[in-house]
């Protein structure tokens, strides 16, 4: 059985995905992130919630105003330190903490932002303060690719709130992205958090802070990414049956992600390779013919999946290298199955292009 050169399921997937990870930024950059912290008007005192205990005194308000009116983060941090020293139980404390986070967010330098937020944690030391600061510092750690710190903070967040869907989803995907980049340190957490996130989404446990459009994204794009991540890890461990199940599920939820089809093609290619090897070891006859037929059916599936991935990637610069990587393989397989001709190949690709909206 002379057929196109077999490159291996994981090799195919890795080469294609490397094309979109080549810039060095984590794949999590496209994944869920925490809502931006609110900013407060300069000099405006934070407003306490009426159901959060005693009304603040004038002294508390004045101390809080020193934080909000501070010229820069360092001045605000110093004022916040004075505030918590004098009024540690104030109902304004959460809003003072949020203001520090908002001040830090104004700095566009991620390294400086991390330093600021870590300093804020050093001053605002109560557990409720950390609950306010941690989401922002987690986001900053991820931007800086400080993954050890990011998973440390994530663990703290989830110990306090095990059903924090944003953290579960984000970090499950990031952990498997890291495994794909040869850093398997965070796989145990990811394999624990991804199923939990899937369960929360599929049972419609919508977090109150997500609006309708955000929740719709979780139920489609992000749910699909979670299944895709689990499928990727199954491929990495050689469990191609599980990988196929997870990736098929991902594709059924979001049919427009070309990367899912790249991975599925890798799984099918592994199935094809096994059948092709069996054909080579068989004597001519009915059994060999039947096995050959099955192998060619797998090749046809690969052709379809490659065409789908290339079609869906059309027009998106992010996926140009993916298209280039797959195009040669697709042409080779297609021409093998069509008498050394590529007639009709472009029409097949065009069929799978994403409809214009």
Positions of PLM-derived features:
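Short coil/turn linking the two alpha-helices of tandem helical-hairpin repeats
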Residues: 67-70, 104-108, 143-145, 172, ...
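Terminal, low-structured helical/coil segments at or just beyond the last alpha-helical repeat
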Residues: 206-212, 280-281, 285-290, 296, ...
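N-terminal leader/linker segments that initiate helical-solenoid repeat arrays
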Residues: 27-100, 104-115, 123-132
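Short coil/linker segments at helix-helix boundaries
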Residues: 74, 111, 132, 173-221, ...
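Bacterial N-terminal signal peptides
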Residues: 11-23
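Short solvent-exposed coil/turn linkers within tandem alpha-helical repeat scaffolds
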Residues: 86-94, 122-132, 144, 159-166, ...
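Alpha-solenoid helical repeat scaffolds
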Residues: 94-99, 130-136, 166-171, 208-214, ...
């Amino acid at each position: 059985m002379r057929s196109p050169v077999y490159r291996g399921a994981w090799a195919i997937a890795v080469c294609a995905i490397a094309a979109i990870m080549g810039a060095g930024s984590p794949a999590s950059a496209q994944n869920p992130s925490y809502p931006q912290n609110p900013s407060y008007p300069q000099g405006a005192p934070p407003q306490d919630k009426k159901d959060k205990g005693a009304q603040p005194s004038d002294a508390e308000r004045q101390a809080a105003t020193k934080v909000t009116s501070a010229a820069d983060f360092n001045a605000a941090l110093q004022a916040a330190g004075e505030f918590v020293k004098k009024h540690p139980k104030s109902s304004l404390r959460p809003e003072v903490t949020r203001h520090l986070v908002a001040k830090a967010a104004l700095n566009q330098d991620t390294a400086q932002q991390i330093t600021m937020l870590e300093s804020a944690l050093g001053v605002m030391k109560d557990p409720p303060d950390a609950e306010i600061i941690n989401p922002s510092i987690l986001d900053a750690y991820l931007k800086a690719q400080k993954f050890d710190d990011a998973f440390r903070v994530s663990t703290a967040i989830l110990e306090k709130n095990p059903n924090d869907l944003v953290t579960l989803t984000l970090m499950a995907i990031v952990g498997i992205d890291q495994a794909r980049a040869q850093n398997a340190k965070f796989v145990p957490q990811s394999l624990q958090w991804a199923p939990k996130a899937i369960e929360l989404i599929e049972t419609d446990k919508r977090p109150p802070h997500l609006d309708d459009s955000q929740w719709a994204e979780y139920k489609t794009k992000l749910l699909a990414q979670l299944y895709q991540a689990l499928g990727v890890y199954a491929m990495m461990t050689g469990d191609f049956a599980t990988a196929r199940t997870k990736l098929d599920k991902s594709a059924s939820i979001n049919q427009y992600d070309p990367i899912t089809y790249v991975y599925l093609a890798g799984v099918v290619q592994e199935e094809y390779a096994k059948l092709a090897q069996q054909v080579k070891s068989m004597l001519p006859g009915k059994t060999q013919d039947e096995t050959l037929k099955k192998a060619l059916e797998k090749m046809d599936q690969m052709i379809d999946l490659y065409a789908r991935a290339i079609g869906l990637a059309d027009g998106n610069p992010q996926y140009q290298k993916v298209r280039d990587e797959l195009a040669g393989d697709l042409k080779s397989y297609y021409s093998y199955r069509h008498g050394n001709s590529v007639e009709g190949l472009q029409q097949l690709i065009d069929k799978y292009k994403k409809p214009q909206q």
